[in-house]
């Protein structure tokens, strides 16, 4: 919906940003019986979640899955009546790591790529004998006594050795977040590993004690219409007129209530939830609290690009038996990773065809996205062809640029967020949510959006 003017009544809550966190917050607030409006600067809701569908192809331009271990997304699907449409990844669910030009499977019995059983370590062809010996010695490595944040590279190198940094932490742990392994915070992104060391003195020993076993359904699920189906269903579940698109907020002010100026008109609300990137939050808050604005704008962001390519099956010689691969920086390629989409999910390509996605840029290679569209497409296409034995040109290509859409939880991020929360207490009724602060990934964004909605609802109800 677009609007040239907004109702001049005072709403309970105004939400700025219709990404998944903002939509989840709106859904929760509507369920509580509060009046809500969501202002979205672009022409559609969903943020980085978007799915393109044509001629039997289904292409997620952003995230393509929901992590089952974090139940917020699956729970929301259940509430929306689409849980029965959730589909697991296809078998086999093998993921690969590129080393010296060859793809090596991550062995069964691994957690986040780390072999936690002796069998997994022995079976792995990814590591040298020296690397395996160093990783096996993790159980003998003393725990850290200093209680302060450190980078993923520092933590993994200290406990598992350099090969684990280069071939697991860099492409997998940092790659998930499009970041630089030397800068990203282990405590902010993988607190479970930090807690394992603290409690047991050994990550491997702690994970073995938990008896981590893969779910028969796999770690991830999606929907037949891609992750965009979740956004479509969630948006439709809100009352007509709740989402106002092409409504870029230009000013936020507070007196007895909050006044929000946007390109769609003026909105007044008792409470405001900012569900936009941290740097946008900062720009909106600068006239109100410049210190808070500085804190928000200090959250670094990376830009990424996704290149999708469609082929006939007979053009690809690689068996594509698995979900895809990641590329360590030591390999010297532009690609960060590749997904074998049609092998990972059912119904993503017409029969006899293959859909692939390649990823470029991120905190590891920030200047890559200075290249033009055709150069990015050609780079991804050529590297995929070399790795997977592809002949001929793709039937089509798509490029999706995500400029400053990947927040980087660098060392010290948790302290910054705590400081932001303290400053927000000076602005009663104003709350922040989304991936820039406490939530990486769809389930966490949904959970944080709904938790923030509950806080906004409590504020409004206490003043009713």
Q: Where are the predicted features?
A:
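Active-site/ligand-binding neighborhood in enzyme catalytic cores
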Residues: 114, 131-251, 255-258
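Hydrophobic anchor at the start of a short beta-strand
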Residues: 13, 34-36, 272, 394-397
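N-terminal Rossmann-like FAD-binding beta1-loop-alpha1 element of flavoenzymes
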Residues: 11-38
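Dinucleotide-binding Rossmann-like beta1-alpha1 core, especially the glycine-rich loop
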Residues: 55-143
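Conserved flavin/dinucleotide-binding core of flavoenzymes
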Residues: 3-4, 107-109, 319-322, 336-464
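Mid-domain catalytic core of redox enzymes
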Residues: 32, 247-356, 363-374, 386-387, ...
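Glycine-rich FAD pyrophosphate-binding loop
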Residues: 30-54
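Conserved Rossmann-like nucleotide-cofactor binding loop
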Residues: 21, 44, 279
């Amino acid at each position: 919906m677009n609007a040239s003017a907004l109702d001049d009544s005072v709403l309970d809550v105004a939400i700025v940003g219709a990404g998944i966190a903002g939509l989840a917050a709106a859904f929760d607030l509507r369920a509580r019986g509060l009046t809500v409006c969501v202002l979205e600067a672009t022409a559609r809701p969903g943020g980085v979640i978007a799915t393109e569908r044509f001629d039997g192809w289904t292409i997620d331009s952003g995230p393509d899955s929901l992590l089952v271990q974090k139940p917020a997304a699956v729970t929301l699907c259940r509430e929306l009546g689409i849980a029965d449409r959730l589909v697991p990844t296809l078998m086999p669910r093998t993921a690969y790591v590129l080393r010296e030009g060859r793809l090596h499977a991550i062995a069964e019995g691994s957690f986040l790529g780390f072999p936690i059983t002796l069998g997994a370590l022995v079976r792995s062809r990814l590591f040298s004998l020296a690397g395996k010996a160093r990783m096996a010695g993790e159980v003998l490595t003393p725990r850290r006594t200093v209680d302060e944040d450190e980078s993923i590279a520092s933590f993994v190198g200290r406990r598992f050795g350099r090969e684990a940094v280069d071939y697991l932490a860099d492409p997998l742990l940092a790659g998930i977040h499009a970041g630089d392994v030397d800068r990203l915070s282990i405590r902010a992104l993988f607190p479970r590993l930090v807690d394992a060391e603290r409690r047991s003195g050994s990550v491997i020993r702690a994970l073995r004690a938990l008896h981590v076993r893969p779910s028969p359904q796999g770690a991830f699920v999606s929907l037949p219409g891609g992750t965009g189906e979740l956004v479509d269903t969630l948006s439709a579940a809100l009352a007509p007129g709740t989402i106002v698109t092409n409504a870029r907020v230009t000013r936020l002010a507070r007196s007895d209530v909050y006044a929000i100026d946007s390109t769609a008109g003026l909105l007044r609300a008792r409470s405001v939830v900012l569900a936009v990137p941290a740097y946008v939050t900062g720009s909106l808050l600068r006239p109100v609290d410049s210190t808070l604005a500085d804190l928000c704008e200090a959250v670094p962001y990376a830009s990424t690009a996704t290149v999708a390519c469609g082929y006939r099956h007979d053009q690809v010689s690689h068996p594509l038996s698995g979900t895809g691969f990641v590329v360590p920086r030591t390999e010297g390629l532009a690609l960060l990773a590749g997904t074998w989409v049609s092998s990972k999910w059912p119904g993503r390509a017409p029969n006899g065809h293959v859909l692939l996605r390649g990823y470029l840029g991120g905190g590891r290679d920030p200047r890559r996205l200075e290249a033009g569209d055709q150069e990015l497409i050609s780079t991804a296409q050529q590297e995929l062809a070399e790795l997977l034995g592809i002949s001929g040109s793709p039937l089509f290509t798509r490029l999706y640029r995500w400029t400053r859409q990947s927040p980087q939880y660098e060392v010290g991020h948790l302290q910054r967020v705590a400081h932001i929360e303290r400053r927000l207490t000076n602005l009663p009724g104003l709350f922040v949510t989304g991936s820039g602060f406490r939530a990486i990934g769809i389930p966490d964004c949904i959970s944080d959006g709904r938790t923030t909605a509950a806080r906004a609802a409590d504020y409004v109800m206490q003043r009713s």
